[in-house]
């Protein structure tokens, strides 16, 4: 599939998952509430999907946004989520292996792409990176954020991983990386192509061969205690 699987497909996936979770609450006559954990890179599309979904449903969808690693940890510790949209495949699989997520519900809902962004207009972010023409470089934490791991792989592929260690600004998730660049606290930053930058600044669409494909899976959480609340 292309950069992002088409919006209609994403909506169908999200709507199906939301409907399934709603029925699992066992209370079709009253307004249900579904807690959804969403990786930071997918928050813009997800908000649009939820807005469309709620036009035809009494279900209230509550989004919790963060890095996939932090959301996974919250779920593992009993956080009351019914759905988890991760930015990778490993964390949903780990929840399935531990019995905390439904194997049959797992689906790849998106394939992410990485960009290098600067708020400078008419700039060449790739040249800025390679030549070192910047002060600070923002990326998400590679230990908890799949897009941070991908950014780290890009630097490794370009032979720059060790060169700019003292210029890195680490965000806990891709949303924080975006804010570092937008606010001017970083000259360059690795962001997701799904994040809405409009016409602000300049970006380099990073070739996919420089990092592993960012396949993103969603799963239903098997937490009966929370689902009955």
Region roles according to the model:
Residues 10-22:
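Bacterial N-terminal signal peptides
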Residues 104:
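Active-site acidic carboxylates
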